[in-house]
Each structure stands twice: as structure tokens, then as C-alpha cells.
Amino acid sequence: MMRHLHDCVAPAKLNLFLHVTGRRDDGYHLLQSVFQLIDLHDVLHFDLRDDGEIVRSTEVAGVPAEADLIVRAARLLKETAAARGIEVPGASIAIEKRLPMGGGIGGGSSDAATTLIALNHLWGTGLTRPELMQLGVRLGADVPFFLLGRNAFVEGIGERLTPMATPATWFVVIHPGVSVPTPTIFTAPELTRDTKAVTIADFSKRLPGFGKNDLQAVAARAFPPVADALEWLSDVGDARMTGSGACVFAAFASETEADAALMTVPSHWRAWKTRTLDAHPMATLLQT
């Protein structure tokens, strides 16, 4: 058995659009979106432990280890293996946290997915991609997307994923220095909850500026730095927010144009140039 698996990438995502089409009786919102993998990422390192413990060996500001999706994902996989009669060792997990928390780019969910992928391989537990996705939904609505490992048209509460091809694109992503709690946005009375449903064909015919983010107006009103970043980025591109915020982004026709925009971003914001990915960098470790 291998003893370690290092430099495991957990990529971010952008919501190219995000429509709220309704709300279920249980309070969950019905969504439509295209989730786009991008090459911004966290990096995780896994080492086996002989004592059977799951340990996060690096500190993450504001996130106790017991509440971290990384630890929860590892323990869930260990429990699932035990239920199948498979005894596995423990693991020490170190993370290089590069993605902002509360940014709407899926950092925590992606970290959890990479943990499931890496430990399923390292432990030899043998779960297939669909089985890992079933575990993932117990950790968070976005986790199954990162386990799917491809860009997708997303519907329902996030559980209906249709893989799709998206064009190669350069983006500038800005984090305006605030963390936006998702429940704050979804519980706002003024949130639009009745956007007309669309199809993959609708999206494909009207790239790149299809649709909107129904959460954007609520987040911009509640968190002025989000509004400021959107206003600034709108001067150089088609700015929109990803997820429930706080990150905003714009697409550019070339890397040169993205570089030019990035150079002018005010220094008090974190900003990145990034490009699309066609597949999750860890996808080769997934069993179909």
C-alpha cells in the first residue's frame, strides 16, 4: 500500500450563470446553473497513519478541524469502508489553502471531493465515481459536481448534473475582501425565486453572456464591497458574481486582455487570472 499522496489539486469553480427557478416545500431552492472548473486551486497532501486517526495537520483560520469538510469527508469514507468490512488506516491531511472562504467558488466542497478521491485511491477502498458522489451529497450540495470531474449543467438543488463542453476562456476573478454567508442570501425576502427555466441549448446558443446570477442583487445590497467590485469590473468586462458571492468575475477573449485587466485591479482586492479546465485534475483516479 502506498503511504502518501501529495500535491493533490482541489480546483475552484465559477457559476457562469445562476437562476433560482423555485423553492420546494422543505425550503430548498431550485436552481439552474453551469458550473465551470477553473485552474485556481487549493493543494492537499495525504499521509497514512498507523493509529487509525484522521488528523488535519495544518491550521485553517476560522475553521476548527472537527467542522472542516476535509476531516468530515475522510471520516465518512472510513466509516463507509468499515461498513463494507474494509479496515483502513488513518490519515494526516495537510492543506495549502489558496482559495478564499465564503467566495462562491466552491473551495470547501472541492477540498472535500479531493479528499474522497485521494483517500479512496490511497486506502484502496474501491468506491466508484457514482458511489463517491452519493457520499459527497451528504457533505454539501456542490461536492458531487467536483466528483463528477467535468463541467456541468446543474439543476434541482444541485443534485442533477449533466456533463457539457464549454469553450476555452480566460477570466479575471476578484475577491472583494468580505465573506458572504450563503444562508443570508437565500433567506432574503427580495430574492428572485421564479426565473423561467432554460435548457442547455439556450445556454449554448448565447455564450458567453448568457443569463444572470439571481443572487447577485441581494449580495450586492447586503455587502457593499461586492457591489464595488462589480461596478469596477463592469468597466473592463461583463462582470457578474459567482455562487452566492463574494467573488466576482469577467470573461476575456484572450490571455492578453485578461492580463491587461488584472494589472489595473485596485490593490486592496485579491485578484487572479485564470482559465477554464475541461476536467478535474484528479479525475484519472476516479473509477467509473
Task: Tell me the role of every PLM-derived stretch.
Residues 36-37, 137-138, 144-147, 163-167, ...:
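Solvent-exposed alpha-helices and their adjacent loops that cap or buttress functional pockets
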Residues 1-102, 121, 125-130, 175-176:
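ATP-binding N-lobe of GHMP and related small-molecule kinases
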Residues 148, 153-238, 253-288:
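Conserved, helical-rich catalytic subdomain that frames metal- and/or nucleotide-binding sites
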Residues 112, 116-153:
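Contiguous, small/hydrophobic- and glycine-enriched helical/loop subdomains that border
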Residues 50-63, 115, 137, 203-213:
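Short, basic/glycine-rich phosphate-binding loops at helix/coil junctions
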Residues 94-123, 141, 238-252:
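Glycine/serine-rich anion-binding loops at beta->alpha junctions
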Residues 16, 44-46, 70, 108, ...:
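Residue-level signal for inorganic ion chemistry
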Residues 73-84, 131, 135-138, 229-236, ...:
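Generic non-transmembrane alpha-helical segments
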